[in-house]
């Protein structure tokens, strides 16, 4: 089980073009954040802070109910912490998702549902804004945005709140197979 440590540190790895987290004992975690998605401070050495540890706990607890292996849950948790701290501010890309017609207000760490004509899926809220939030894809197989674009597991996108619904409703919206 992965536990945050004050010995962890963030740095940018030029050869891979990715933000890395040094976990100590010669263990490294490569995030899914490339240089074009990072704020300027990500290109220098950064300690793993108390805020990072708090975000780690928040995201890990929220993801604990999902049917993911411990390894995949830890991976997603670290992707979320990295994006929360180092992802560049971006404009919403809500046109990829159907409107729900609601004025839903998600909170950080909450699981939400997004859908379009191709699929529906779970996302975790990384940063909750007034009208839009940065969310990360929780679907292991990714999420199709269009016929030619997709989000991979752990990839972040900013979406207007009127496209989101609570994940608690997802069970009623998902098709079920009757067995027996």
From Swiss-Prot:
InterPro entries: ZapC, ZapC_C, ZapC_N. The keyword Cell division applies. The keyword Cytoplasm applies. It holds the Pfam family ZapC_N. It comes from Vibrio vulnificus (strain CMCP6). Contributes to the efficiency of the cell division process by stabilizing the polymeric form of the cell division protein FtsZ. Acts by promoting interactions between FtsZ protofilaments and suppressing the GTPase activity of FtsZ. GO terms for biological process: division septum assembly; FtsZ-dependent cytokinesis. This is Cell division protein ZapC. It comes from the Bacteria. Interacts directly with FtsZ. It is found in: Cytoplasm. GO terms for cellular component: cytoplasm. Belongs to the ZapC family. Keywords: Cell cycle, Cell division, Cytoplasm, Septation.
